[in-house]
């Protein structure tokens, strides 16, 4: 297995902590733990953690955490939640679990590099569907259907998109889901930036 160098991470590792002005940053300024607790109103959280034993823990993640994650979605239960080491770990696990050499993986790009480099390293046939400025960075569903071709194993997208920030609405997500269902393909929707476009209560519609 050989994975292409992760260009953006290598660049960020070399330069992001050494510059005066970082115009490429996608994250907000970091908070201290105290600021975060004050912001959420859970100032007694530390006292809740101190009696906790540092055991091996549940393989799938604690019931409390899985229930909290499930509550972020309209129709999900803790049984459908698996705790991983971030979205990177979750994506990696999905590709290693589902993709075999020769399988077709369709990646909507630009996107996080692992969504095409990992399947490529496994030996998958990777098809890229490009978002275009003239289409407001929205996926062309006809082009997507052609790439799926009735035989894709996995279709991946990031929503909100990384790096353009474009957002696929609930109606288009439903159409993409239908294309995947028709082909018997898994839809991997990386929603790590879900909520950054939030206005008012609630968060961005999820494909889940």
Where are these regions (language model features)?
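N-terminal small-domain helix-loop-helix segment of the aminotransferase-like
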Residues: 2-86, 93
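Generic structural signal for small/hydrophobic residues in well-ordered secondary structure
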Residues: 23-26, 69, 81, 105, ...
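Short acidic capping loops at alpha-helix termini that bridge into adjacent secondary structure
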Residues: 77-81, 101-104, 151
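Conserved PLP-anchoring active-site segment centered on the Schiff-base-forming lysine
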Residues: 97-119
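A short helix->loop->beta-strand "cap" motif at the edges of active sites that frequently abuts
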Residues: 103, 124, 182-185
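Aromatic/hydrophobic pocket-lining residues that form π-stacking "cages" and hydrophobic walls in ligand
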Residues: 115, 176, 207
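A short helix-loop-beta submotif of the ANL/AMP-binding
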Residues: 120-126
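Active-site phosphate-binding strand-loop segment of PLP-dependent enzymes
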Residues: 133-203
């Amino acid at each position: 297995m050989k994975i292409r160098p992760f260009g953006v991470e290598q660049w960020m590792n070399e330069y992001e902590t050494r510059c005066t002005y970082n115009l490429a940053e996608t994250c907000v300024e970091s908070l201290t733990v105290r600021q975060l607790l004050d912001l959420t109103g859970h100032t007694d959280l530390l006292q809740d953690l101190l009696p906790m034993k540092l055991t091996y823990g549940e393989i799938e993640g604690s019931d409390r955490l899985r229930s909290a994650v499930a509550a972020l979605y309209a129709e999900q239960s803790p049984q459908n939640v698996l705790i991983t080491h971030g979205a990177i770990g979750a994506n990696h696990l999905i590709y290693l679990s589902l993709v075999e050499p020769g399988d077709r993986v369709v990646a909507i790009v630009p996107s996080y590099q692992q969504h095409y480099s990992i399947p490529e390293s496994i030996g998958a046939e990777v098809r890229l569907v490009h978002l275009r400025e003239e289409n407001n960075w929205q996926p062309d569903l006809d082009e997507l259907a052609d790439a799926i071709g009735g035989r894709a194993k996995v279709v991946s997208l990031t929503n909100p998109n990384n790096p353009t920030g474009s957002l696929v609405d609930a109606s288009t997500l439903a159409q993409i889901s239908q294309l995947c269902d028709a082909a018997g393909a898994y839809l991997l929707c990386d929603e790590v930036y879900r909520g950054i476009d939030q206005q008012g209560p609630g968060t961005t519609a999820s494909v889940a």
